[in-house]
From Swiss-Prot:
This is L-aspartate dehydrogenase 2. The gene is nadX2. It comes from the Bacteria. The active site is at H219. HAMAP family: NadX. Specifically catalyzes the NAD or NADP-dependent dehydrogenation of L-aspartate to iminoaspartate. NCBIfam families: PRK13301.1, PRK13303.1-3, PRK13303.1-4. One of its GO terms (biological process) is NAD biosynthetic process. It is an enzyme of class 1 (oxidoreductase). InterPro entries: Asp/hSer_DH_NAD-bd (IPR005106), Asp_DH (IPR002811), Asp_DH_prok (IPR020626), L-Asp_DH (IPR011182), NAD(P)-bd_dom_sf (IPR036291). Gene3D superfamilies: Dihydrodipicolinate Reductase, domain 2, NAD(P)-binding Rossmann-like Domain.
Amino acid sequence: MTHRIAFIGLGAIASDVAAGLLADAAQPCQLAALTRNAADLPPALAGRVALLDGLPGLLAWRPDLVVEAAGQQAIAEHAEGCLTAGLDMIICSAGALADDALRARLIAAAEAGGARIRVPAGAIAGLDYLQAVAGRDDAEVVYESRKPVAAWRAELPGMGIDPDTLAESRTLFSGPAREAALRFPKNLNVAATLALAGIGMTRTRVEVVVDPQARGNQHRIQVRSPLGEMQIELVNAPSPANPKTSWLVAHSVLATIRRHLARFTIG
């Protein structure tokens, strides 16, 4: 069976995912993308990914699955229309879901259209554990994001920090996951994913650190409850095309697509 998969956005993550799908002969796919600029199409995908004109064009193409990888604004603009039309979605920009009103609208649209919403793990691990403790009022979750200067170069000047002279680690934020995800839409989707899987946007605590000595994009997750403790530390290689995101993210999205299409899954 050939699956029809449409991307919203065709940046670093979506391009890597598209290339992975096209290379998988065991799971043939037809691909399309809704993108603001046709020049975004990498040469390796030219002629292999159809370019769509706006949400009407995407709906007319009739995909089996829509993969959003364009940022939080794209969710506000396109997700509700896709879900109402009955199109299953994978949402990569999970930070948008920190907005309770938007998340409620999307869930209502999915119910009306008979569609499903999936959020990939992305750069992190341990979501199954967080889901297991989600209902406990006595659970504590702390997440630390520690990234090198390259991941924050565009934002640091606005915080009064010179990225070229920063010599020591600096805490940029400490607080609830909701505020972290909405304040840093390009860097903290992970915070929203953890909170949605676990104990919620308010109780999940987030520490954001820029560290000139950081080895890759580092993620530390600590969970404590009477059920036990979990500590995970990941050191992910940054994406070659976008240092704000981990290279692992595209592979996580690809794995989520394969699970969505599979008859047999684990986890």
